[in-house]
Amino acid sequence: IYNKFFGESERNVREALELAATMSRCVLWIDEIEKGIAVGDNDGGTSRRVLGTLLTWMAENKSQVFLVATANDIERLPPELIRKGRLDEIFFVDLPSPAVREVIFQIHLEKRGLSVDRFDLPALSEHSDGFTGAEIEQAVVAGLYSAGAADGVLDQALLEAELAATVPLSVTMAESLARLRQWCQGRAVHAGA
C-alpha cells in the first residue's frame, strides 16, 4: 500500500477499497491496522492522508463490504477511526480459555498427522495456561523438531517439556496485557470463549 511517491499511498488505498466494492458482498480484512495508519509525525503526513482516505470511504461507501480490522495495540489508533458510526463494534479477544486451548492443540496435532488420542489434551491445556494460539502451535512445532533430532516421536512428555521451556507473552508482556485488559473494560465487547 505505502509508496515513496507523494499521493501514491492514498491512491493505492483508494484502488484497494474500490476493488473490494466491486467484489461486494465481501469481507475486507485489515490485519494489524495500527501498523498501517498509526498517526505520527515522522512520515510527512502520509499516514494521516491514508487514514483520511479510509475514513472518507467508510463514511461514503454504500457497497456491501463488511470491514473487519484487527489491532494488537488499539491505543495507537486515532479516536476518529474507532468512534461509533465508523466502527459498529469493538471486540476484545483475550487469551484462549482451557477448552479453546484443547481445541488449538487438537488442530495443530492433527494438522501434522498426529493422533490426538496419544495426548492428554486437558493436561496440555493446563500446562499452556497464558499461552496464545501461536505459542501453542510453536510448542508443537518445536516438539516435533526435538523428537526428530532424537530419532523419536512427539509424545506427551516431550510436548510438556516444550511448554515448560516457553515463556509466553502473557508473562513477558504482563504489564501491557494488564493495560489492554483494563482499557477494554467498558469500551469493548468481550469475545472470549
Per-region residue spans from a language model:
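C-terminal engagement/docking regions of AAA+ P-loop ATPases
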Residues: P122-V140, A149-A193
